[in-house]
Amino acid sequence: MDGTLLNSDKTLSEENLNAILKLREAGGKFVVSTGRVMQATRHYFEPVGVDFPVILSNGGMIYDCHENKVMWSEYLPEGSSRKMVSDLLERFPEACAEICTPEHIYDVQINEQERIHWKKGGFTAEIMESLDDVPDGNWCKVLFAMPE
């Protein structure tokens, strides 16, 4: 979506909105495919609607917006993912880990870069005291934010 459907200020341009409407008028269908998770995507396409399930997390999840349910997903391996995140947070204590599940976004070691990411992405996360507080299972994406 970034750099394609959305313009540089992360909004859906009038031109793209009109193109979607024109596509539908011609009998076409509109679908979204993005590296984002649902919480950082939904508010962009709700005004225009989608005709098919949305492809999220770089193909790691297919989500039916009409039924509000995950149709298919490939989650990160539980044990090794938690260990990797733990190791990286220990090595880079200034980093924030953003852990995404179908229902929640959790932040561990919140920092200013992550707060900027929230603002640009149009979402917020649940701030966790430690990685141990993040529930196991259904991690679909992990991002790291840190100062340059």
Describe each model-derived feature in a short phrase:
Residues 10-11, 17, 67, 76, ...:
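Short capping/connector residues at structural and topological boundaries
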Residues 14-114:
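Active-site phosphate-binding/coordination module
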Residues 87, 91-148:
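Conserved acidic, metal-coordinating active-site core of Asp-based
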Residues 1-10, 84:
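Asp-based phosphoryl-transfer active-site loop
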